[in-house]
Amino acid sequence: MAIIIAIIAAVIVIAALITFNVRNASPGPEKQEATDRIAPPEEEKNEAHYPAEARAAEHTPSVVKNDSPKEKRDTMGDDIYRQALQKFKHSDEVHAEEEVTEESDKMQDRSYRDALLSMKNKKK
């Protein structure tokens, strides 16, 4: 019995919340009048006195050369990074060009087999 009453109460609360939310979301005649009375922003009024080109010119970034020690340090760090990156790229190309000879393959296989045999012997 208590469960049924709790369910009915929950349904009533949910219905009330939905109704309250819908009433606040839809503009009534009072809210429409208030929005009509609001004056347009100052920017729209001054559009004729202050054209868009002038506003755009204010926001364009200008290139300023600054020889501060911090900027010099940053550019030096960038140069070092670029040099290191080129070294890594060059070393990758060198390793890619190296061909694996048949003798080196045999040596690697032999050392691998020796390692496996020594592991098997340790287990015994």
UniProtKB/Swiss-Prot annotation:
Where are the bilayer-spanning segments? 2-22
Query: According to the UniProt entry, where is the signal peptide?
Result: none
Assigned keywords, A-Z: Membrane, Transmembrane, Transmembrane helix
Q: Where in the cell is it found?
A: Membrane
Q: How does it sit in the membrane?
A: Single-pass membrane protein
Q: Could you tell me where the Basic and acidic residues compositional bias lies? A: 30-58, 67-81, 89-113
Q: Where is this region: Disordered?
A: 24-124
Give Gene Ontology CC terms.
Answer: membrane
Q: Which residues form a coiled coil?
A: none
**What is the protein's given name?**
Uncharacterized protein YhcC
